[in-house]
A protein has these predicted regions:
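Compositionally biased, charged N-terminal/linker segments
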Residues: 1-53, 60-62, 93-95, 100-114
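Short beta-strand element of the conserved SAM-dependent methyltransferase core
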Residues: 17, 68, 87-91
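Acidic, aromatic-enriched beta-alpha/helix-loop junctions
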Residues: 51-55, 84-86
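Positively charged, phosphate-engaging catalytic surfaces used for nucleic-acid and nucleotide handling
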Residues: 57-59, 80
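Short beta-strand-centered aromatic/proline hotspots
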Residues: 65-75
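Short conserved micro-motifs at the rims of enzyme active sites and ligand-binding pockets
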Residues: 69, 79-80, 97-100
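Short, solvent-exposed secondary-structure boundary/capping segments
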Residues: 75-90
Length: 114
């Protein structure tokens, strides 16, 4: 039986971002209207650490639904707080889509190979 859990490629430095709340909710007051905007904006993280990632994986309900190659990182104000965001391109096809990711605790950001 094939393992359906994420097994990272050794050279990939990965950030997994749990977007279950924003992606599934589709709050009409939220400006994130598509998958890319759900995953790229408003993260609390160390931007210097984030800049070392060569892959960003969007995770909803424990399953990877998209993979991106970040091209740049920056800060943005959101609801009065400074948050990180990235600009990048989607990777299609992806070896990671459909794989499961487990999170411990409540942090929606998970670093792998970093």
């Amino acid at each position: 039986m094939e393992n359906d859990y994420l097994e990272p490629i050794p050279d990939d430095c990965i950030i997994c971002l749990n977007i279950s709340k924003t992606y599934n909710r589709r709050d009409p007051d939220d400006i994130r209207l598509d998958l890319y905007d759900c995953v790229r904006k408003y993260w609390v993280m160390d931007i210097n650490r984030a800049k070392t990632a060569n892959r960003v994986l969007a995770v909803a309900d424990g399953v990877i639904i998209a993979e991106y190659e970040p091209e740049s990182w920056g800060h943005i104000e959101h609801k009065g707080r400074r948050r990180c965001y990235f600009e990048g391109k989607e990777i299609v096809p992806s070896a990671y889509i459909g794989k499961r990711v487990t999170y411990r605790g409540q942090n929606p950001v998970k670093y792998i190979n970093m």
